[in-house]
Amino acid sequence: MAAEICREEAAKSMPAAAAGATAIARRRRRVEGFRFAAGSLEPPQEDADAGVARCGKRQRVAGARAGAGAATAGPCRPSAGAEFGSRWWPRYGVTSVFGRRREMEDAVSIRPDFLRGSTSSGKHHFFGVFDGHGCSHVARMCQDRMHELVVDAYKKAVSGKEAAAAAPAWKDVMEKGFARMDDEATIWAKSRTGGEPACRCELQTPARCDHVGSTAVVAVVGPNRVVVANSGDSRAVLCRAGVPVPLSVDHKPDRPDELERIKAAGGRVIYWDGARVLGVLAMSRAIGDGYLKPYVTSEPEVTVTERADDDECLILASDGLWDVVTNEMACEVVRACFRSNGPPSPPGCSRPKAVLPPPAGASGGGGGDAVVKGVDKAESDKACADAALLLAKLAIARRSADNVSVVVVDLRRPVP
């Protein structure tokens, strides 16, 4: 089913002249964008490093191109049973591709059990997609620091309370975490006098690091609820009983409430290749972008959703996917992949693994690398990895002009 969708969209998008040499060259370049660094993360030990799938994102200025994408997946849930137990462990898959961009400016962060030692109310898992613009610096900073700042805010929220009974206001926790992330990005931008090697900041004269920013959509998945915080136009969608439930709303400058907020702050929305803040930025909220403050704010919108028996999956993705794929279609692709791989395994059983090529460029660099940390094996949960990859391919087939990063989290209960 999912493969048929991709083939149909590819057929629609390719003109009759695609048989020519130019079209063949384009397809070859597109295929090059699907190199992977992959792995599976075991449940963390006391000092185990959390998993990260890493990349970079946006703009059309030529720059160095290194690795191209990342795919990683979580292992089988070690224990679940009839209830969402405190040791519940999600499966997940990640795909990031260049698409039609010269550079990768997306970044993805996967941090299993990231509140370890801070709560006794069950394991909580952090998933984040960061879509950079101007360069990948801020997206990479969010990738490395956002989960740590959320942990700090969480600890302060439960300070002086019994950890098991503490029910922190997640809205406040996320807002403080995002605010500190924005402060760090602003301080970094002011301290820079030029770009890093092999990044586009150095191509600007003078180098303007305060022109760099990133969207941020973050999900904290726990045994009983899913918390989503969003700033920008990346998106989180929950699939529940086959019906897509948006857990975030894109921050576009022409969204009525955002337009009023920008005007109240003294800014303007100019329609130049779409609605843009001051005719520049195509989103109304982001981390960084110091030169557009206070019109562009980092304050996230936060939703807290109680988990249900018929939850199937959570999809986080950059606008490279959502610009061309509807919520309904994305959910159907994931459900088709889940059906083809069978029901979730019972506790203690291994899922089928999809073995992928070794990393294509695993060293850090100036914004175009794909790095997976804390991974020992080149393998991925098949259902989640298939779903994430198919969604990325579908976006490319539908002529997405951006980097595409997709995270698929399996929320289904295991079959006893």
From Swiss-Prot:
Residues 91-411 form the PPM-type phosphatase domain. Its EC number is 3.1.3.16. It is an enzyme of class 3 (hydrolase). One of its GO terms (molecular function) is protein serine/threonine phosphatase activity. InterPro entries: PP2C, PP2C_BS, PPM-type-like_dom_sf, PPM-type_phosphatase-like_dom. Binds 2 magnesium or manganese ions per subunit. SMART domains: PP2Cc. Keywords: Hydrolase, Magnesium, Manganese, Metal-binding, Protein phosphatase. It catalyses: O-phospho-L-seryl-[protein] + H2O = L-seryl-[protein] + phosphate; O-phospho-L-threonyl-[protein] + H2O = L-threonyl-[protein] + phosphate. Belongs to the PP2C family. This is Probable protein phosphatase 2C 49. It comes from Oryza sativa subsp. japonica (Rice).
